């Protein structure tokens, strides 16, 4: 009986040691993969503690001083998309704010920049008078640019752009299904002075009227037939270029190929794709005026950069990637569930061995 107890004790001890060694080997392997992952690129990051902190870090990178800024509601990616070409034209930052409160980090950044005037994009239900009152407390003037809906707001912004420089090209983005495509297109469109008209099926006639009234020569339709049917091309008298892919990732790459000289392309910004977290779009739009100035495109990624995206970067000679709003993770060989499971097994084994020892002492070896 004594030999049997010793044998069982050794088995349990060996099992615990093997479990710990196995878990340790997984961690070592994961650490190695993390170090090697994307090692062919120089990696930089602009990541704050929250969305507002990330905005201020983008602002700090792009603007030492700016007498003007643009405010967009955190609930209106649509207005954010149409605002980027104006922000680029005026060389001013964009901040996304709550409808009734300016985050303290944004307030501090406004003071650092020396902002004297803010353009509020959208109606009062998006950015209320409480925002106006806070601006007054900061001795900052404001001007509201808005229409009765997102389409009309985008038209107002386009007209503002036209006041400073006559527009000959426009882009159409579907405000319902085309937001992901619109976000990553903004830097390239803005750099070329192309305003973005946000529209849906109900506003297409008004969009066509705007194109005709301004003698637009060329129209970029961003997105596939789900966003815009082929019939829209027949209604537009200008030259039409449709940029589309099978999904947001492929459309993203098509946009870059359309507007960028890929032979000279060596840097890129990477943001998360917005599938899980809406704030990812806000990161991209805050970044967009700066990316437009630098002529650096934005690429979508999930938590890990996909094989197709990595190949796209390598094929186009990208050597520097800047991760904005998040840090790209390497492929996981150890998931959180695996860690929890392995830890639970180790704890059970340790408790079992400890319990056996206690029972043995308690019953003087009879167990």
Predicted regions and their residues:
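N-terminal Lys/Arg-rich, disordered targeting/topogenic segments
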Residues: 1-8, 367
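Extracellular glycan-binding segments that recognize GlcNAc-based cell-wall polysaccharides
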Residues: 7-16, 25-364
